[in-house]
Amino acid sequence: MASKSQFPYEDRARDHPNPLARRLFQIATEKQSNVVVSADVTTTKELLDLADRLGPYMVVLKTHIDILADFSAETITGLQSLSQKHNFLIFEDRKFVDIGNTVQKQYHGGALHISEWAHIVNATVLPGPGIIDALAQVASAPDFPHASDRGLLILATMTSKGSLATGQYTELSVELARKYKGFVLGFVASRSLEGVETAGKADDEDFVLFTTGVNLASKGDALGQQYQTPESAIGGGADFIISGRGIYAAPDPVDAARRYQKAGWDAYLKRVGR
């Protein structure tokens, strides 16, 4: 798979064919940050407080909205307001994994109304191509008002020990990203996918890579999570680094966010030769 990871964010913001990817790289350039905060908290108050305090230092806020015990319309209006205030995107880590008809309802309806507020969502290709097609249909529908501001990340690899997201699964992830590149921004992956070759490759493709499990202090947890540092993640091809407990569970989350911002940005500057 072709990679443009050696190019500066501002170049990718200028040249990227996907409008949401352009916006993502523009925000990163303006804020000098490639940090995605995974705010795995369980109340709306905690979530909005973190989003407000950490908003200046992150590019994307990643949510697991279904773990909130008190989710309501106020949760969403609060997130949208803070997204505008601090100029960050919202990534709902829903990991869609069902038949197409079901994921369309999960994405565009139900209790969560995800398509109305989440700029980015993700999915696994375990159900086959239909899941990506179904989500893309929602975003491209004539009556959908947010088409240019929505995108999908395909879960191509995982950081948990013993993950089966390898080999043919990863290859299918790349193949479907190429087929639906108007909607697919890129991947959630623990490493660069540059060596993955499939049909449909184009010289100008520029898929964005989000890497999870980034932690400055820990190498893992008791449940099989495996961490890497901002420097190793960016050096390995990540465009954006996702950190959860390393930031929000720190004694001073704001100080932690600043440290991750600096570490991630320094690693990016090193990668592009600045």
UniProtKB/Swiss-Prot annotation:
Belongs to the OMP decarboxylase family. Coiled coil: none annotated. This is Orotidine 5'-phosphate decarboxylase. GO terms for biological process: 'de novo' pyrimidine nucleobase biosynthetic process; 'de novo' UMP biosynthetic process. InterPro entries: Aldolase_TIM, OMPdecase, OMPdecase_AS, OMPdeCOase_dom, RibuloseP-bd_barrel. Pathway: Pyrimidine metabolism; UMP biosynthesis via de novo pathway; UMP from orotate: step 2/2. CDD domains: OMP_decarboxylase_like. Its EC number is 4.1.1.23. The active site is at K95. Substrate binds at residues 40, 62-64, 93-102, 227, 245. The gene is URA3. Keywords: Decarboxylase, Lyase, Pyrimidine biosynthesis. It catalyses: orotidine 5'-phosphate + H(+) = UMP + CO2. One of its GO terms (molecular function) is orotidine-5'-phosphate decarboxylase activity. GO terms for cellular component: cytosol. It holds the Pfam family OMPdecase. It comes from the Eukaryota. It is an enzyme of class 4 (lyase). It comes from Coccidioides posadasii (strain RMSCC 757 / Silveira) (Valley fever fungus).
